[in-house]
A protein has these predicted regions:
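Conserved Rossmann-fold NAD(P)-dependent oxidoreductase catalytic core, especially the SDR/UDP-sugar
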Residues: 8, 13, 17-64, 84-85
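Glycine-rich Rossmann NAD(P)(H)-binding loop
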Residues: 92-97, 127-134, 161-169, 178-180
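Glycine/proline-rich active-site loop of Rossmann-fold NAD(P)-dependent oxidoreductases
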Residues: 95-108, 149-161
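Mid/C-terminal beta-alpha module of Rossmann-like enzyme folds, strongest
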Residues: 146-194
Length: 194
């Protein structure tokens, strides 16, 4: 519980308080537009298609990351006194050509497990794995290029833009993509633990 509360407080400080300070600074500096990088996580565990024009419809925001991302976007929507644009990328991963990334989180946590499997099992060995939920991962260069393009479009202030891959992958599919890249065995039998 102590670790959970510490992480919750850190996310609150970074996502909500940090956004509030940035919005206030942009207003005081007379910025022409506030560009907020949010996340598709603002939808929480919404079932179905969460469109760019949706916000209040978010569901099941119990997880600290979902909740703080949602609240930080709310700060922009309610307290920003200058024009703004909101960008909601999927889970950001490394550069599409080089793989380079400057932080390890999200899907990267599974890499160590896949490396361990690769080191003890032959590549031809079929594995059983979990396959729950859909993931949307986008390379960092795709996100940067999309934001650069959208930030320079005329007449889009107040807009919200999803920066996602139109081809979603299940957890099992994603793990197999990573396993193939690591020359590790694949998860040929996958089950949903629910």
């Amino acid at each position: 519980a102590v670790i959970h509360n510490h992480l919750d407080a850190a996310m609150q400080a970074a996502n909500i308080t940090g956004t509030l300070y940035a919005v206030q600074a942009a207003g005081q500096l007379g910025a022409r537009c506030f560009h907020h990088v949010s996340s598709i996580a603002v939808s929480g565990l919404y079932r179905g298609t969460f469109r760019e024009d949706m916000f209040e419809e978010a569901e099941n925001l119990d997880h600290a990351y979902f909740r703080t991302k949602h609240e930080s976007e709310k700060v922009v929507r309610q307290q920003c006194r200058i024009p703004y644009r909101i960008y909601r990328p999927g889970a950001v991963v490394g550069h599409s050509r080089t793989g380079e990334i400057d932080k390890i989180d999200g899907p990267y946590y599974s890499f160590k497990m896949i490396q361990r499997i690769r080191n003890v099992m032959p590549k031809w060995m079929p594995l059983v794995g979990v396959d729950s939920g859909i993931n949307n991962i986008v390379p960092v260069d795709y996100v940067v290029n999309a934001i650069d393009f959208l930030a320079h479009l005329d007449g889009q202030d107040g807009g919200c833009f999803h920066i996602v891959d139109t081809e979603h992958h299940s957890t099992g599919q994603m793990m197999n993509i990573f396993a193939e890249a690591a020359h590790a065995p694949k998860f040929v039998m996958r089950f949903d633990p629910k």
